[in-house]
Amino acid sequence: MQDNPSIQFDDQRLAKRQQLIEAGVPMYPHEFRRSHTIAEIRAKYSQAGHDPSSDQVITAGRLYGVRDHGKTFFADLRDETGRIQLYIRKDALPEGKFQMFKSSIERGDIIGVTGRIFKTKVGEISIFVDDIILLTKTLCSLPEKFHGLTNLEKRYRQRYLDLIVNEESRETFRTRSRIISLLRNYLTGQGFLEFETPTLQPLYGGANARPFTTFHNFLGQKLYLRIAPELYLKRLVVGGFEKVFEVAKNFRNEDIDTSHNPEFSMVEIYQAYADYTDMMKLTEGIISSIVHEVTGSYEVAFEENTISYKAPWTVMSMEEAVRTIGKVDIFAHDLESLKKIGKEKGVDGIDDVHTQREMLVLFFEALVEDKLIQPTFITDFPVENSPLAKSHREKEGFVERFELFIAGMELANGFSELNDPLDQMERFEAQEEKRRLGDEEAQMHDYDFVNALGYGMPPTGGVGIGIDRLVMLITGNTSIKEVILFPSMKREVTTPADEEEPSSV
């Protein structure tokens, strides 16, 4: 039964399960009707006296912390809403139930109880148990009570166990759920409509990234997991929807580290008749509102810093940031001088670029990004790095694009969206040339999208906000694995599929 090391059934628990079956005790009843959750009991009976009330409550949860006192037991029962103490006495239970509890029910099992509420002498709200029903006999032992589950890899691989034993993890994911709800509410309150666009796409685009590839047998064609929903959402703007968004799962075949996971969540937002300055204001409003709603403050601690989300946030161009923070005036030096300075400062990739504008991006990434602790919009990116953004109205060779940085992490990316179909075609052709030269992250030429622009897209602003990183910042978690329920990890056990050659398609 336990040939696979992923299955960790406990032999003693299996034996107790068999004893219960032989005694005719149902292991897994089909349902159990509660009269109250634990939080409801605590709220309703907070003024209970020391003698059990005449009111009967029926509740259920997972059993923790069993304390044996011979003919009585104390135990902790927990459900999603909270914890309550059980007082179990032999002479108060139906015949045989106390012995069943003592011999076969243990920490981690899920039980239902019927009883009356009272307060102990120290003021602890408790249930005087009149009956116990076993709802689920667990076969795996929980980690030791006082040390919990501290192995990081096990916490990520067995998130279900992490959630059982670590309240901090449960609270993180409660907060994540609330953040996403608040995000949706904010946007719909501003008149945006939520849409769903394809996850399997015949072309990948919307960002520079290496895609995951698959094959559709019936269609007989290669498909890609989306790296961004951008081009489909902008088609909706062409079609007449003026304020659109999608909370999307995106997939990028990239490295895994503390701020990157191959499968991640973003919200992408597009608004007709707006530009990148409008999208910066929208982004600022969304994030500051969510932070205040969740934490009750605009000041949130992250690592050793206190981040202030109170508007207005800092806005500076990339050129200004490199000059003032990185201490390099890019356009005051020629390429050879910049290469020399870059090597002295440890800037990577400088031998692979051929313009000052491309140098600007490399210097920014190496010298500035991790110093942007407070919320900062970096604006005006080189055209070479932004194939979907509109050319800057004042700066030749640049586009109207911004990225938001907080605590040294990129949190959002937005544009005045390119809506000139001929300009877009030229940008795609430049990306295709990069692909021919071996750049796996360059975008594909989406002819249908160019055709859509030919029908006319109004001036449009767009932004994508990383949900996982936003949750990290609000909850104080420094690893993206802490805020994704089931992060990507290398499989522990090799399977035949791992030994197959990668498909040529």
Swiss-Prot record:
InterPro entries: Aa-tRNA-synt_II, aa-tRNA-synth_II, aa-tRNA-synth_II/BPL/LPL, Lys-tRNA-ligase_II, Lys-tRNA-ligase_II_N, Lys-tRNA-synth_II_C, NA-bd_OB-fold, NA-bd_OB_tRNA. Pfam families: tRNA-synt_2, tRNA_anti-codon. It catalyses: tRNA(Lys) + L-lysine + ATP = L-lysyl-tRNA(Lys) + AMP + diphosphate. It is found in: Cytoplasm. Its cofactor is Mg(2+). Binds 3 Mg(2+) ions per subunit. SUPFAM superfamilies: Class II aaRS and biotin synthetases, Nucleic acid-binding proteins. Keywords: Aminoacyl-tRNA synthetase, ATP-binding, Cytoplasm, Ligase, Magnesium, Metal-binding, Nucleotide-binding, Protein biosynthesis. GO terms for molecular function: ATP binding; lysine-tRNA ligase activity; magnesium ion binding; tRNA binding. Its EC number is 6.1.1.6. This is Lysine--tRNA ligase. It comes from Methanospirillum hungatei JF-1 (strain ATCC 27890 / DSM 864 / NBRC 100397 / JF-1). The lineage of its organism: Archaea, Methanobacteriati, Methanobacteriota, Stenosarchaea group, Methanomicrobia.
